[in-house]
């Protein structure tokens, strides 16, 4: 084979990945989901490096992933390849995910507190953007549905992941959004967008939030857009103790997913144990 020519297996993988990507589009999967699947598949085919795609190769890849990735990441990547194998009608090649014990407590190094959130808001140039995400619990991908019209009605209709749901906007937020729109001459359409009028994406917001860490005095590991959604969930659950209604507000079809969002670091449990006063020995 001449230099520069692709090997047959490389042509196969590229062609099949492209066809699979088209299939995901037809399934109306979200852009982020499709990007994730395709990225994982490319990693898998790079690992194969021309080897036959058989059960042994899949098990080798799983073993390799366990040595280089966290268990949750391993399962996520295996799920991408298993989806591809289902599409190829090769279910016999699918590999089982790792068994992970359900976490009861969250990592305290990633739990954003209300006080830390206040400091981020104080340090932010566009404070209303962060408050909009945190006070509604929306995904960053749903920010484009927060419009001048929704600021007037107090609700936005979001079409995400093939499902339509209603996002409720608190009255205080609506007033702030309407004032924001008046100042910027926004009469209709998306409120938070780029200079070109395109919706802000996760990378835009992630970068801006990371720049606030030093001035706000908050650990970088706690500062990312999705953590605002987690803070919303924990705050709501602490007030209402209604997991089912919280699932509706977050747009979850499975309450088990919602339960993950309400996990605490365990610091409160530790304080409660300390108040019991059952240790008398002092050092």
PLM regions: where:
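Conserved catalytic core of the tyrosine transesterase superfamily
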Residues: 1-283
């Amino acid at each position: 084979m001449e230099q520069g020519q692709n090997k047959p297996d490389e042509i196969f993988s590229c062609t099949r990945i492209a066809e699979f990507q088209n299939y995901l589009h037809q399934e109306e999967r979200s852009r982020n989901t499709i990007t994730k699947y395709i990225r994982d598949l490319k990693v898998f085919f790079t690992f194969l490096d021309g080897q036959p795609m058989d059960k042994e190769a899949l098990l080798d890849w799983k073993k390799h992933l366990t040595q280089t990735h966290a268990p949750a990441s391993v399962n996520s990547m295996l799920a991408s390849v298993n989806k591809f194998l289902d599409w190829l009608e090769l279910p016999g090649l699918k590999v089982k995910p790792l068994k992970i014990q359900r976490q009861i407590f969250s990592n305290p190094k990633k739990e954003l507190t209300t006080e830390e959130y206040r400091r981020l808001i104080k340090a932010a140039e566009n404070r209303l953007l962060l408050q909009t995400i945190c006070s509604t619990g929306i995904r960053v991908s749903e920010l484009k549905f927060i419009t001048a019209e929704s600021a007037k009605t107090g609700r936005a209709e979001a079409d995400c992941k093939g499902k339509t749901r209603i996002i409720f906007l608190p009255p205080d937020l609506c007033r702030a959004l309407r004032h924001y729109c008046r100042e910027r001459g926004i009469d209709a359409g998306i409120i938070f967008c780029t200079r070109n009028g395109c919706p802000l994406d996760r990378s835009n917001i992630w970068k801006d939030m990371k720049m606030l860490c030093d001035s706000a005095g908050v650990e970088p590991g706690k500062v990312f857009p999705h953590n605002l959604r987690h803070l919303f969930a924990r705050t709501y659950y602490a007030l209402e103790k209604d997991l089912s209604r919280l699932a509706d507000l977050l747009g979850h079809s499975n309450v088990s997913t919602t339960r993950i969002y309400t996990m605490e670091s365990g610091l409160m449990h530790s304080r409660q144990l300390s108040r019991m006063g059952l240790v008398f020995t002092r050092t």
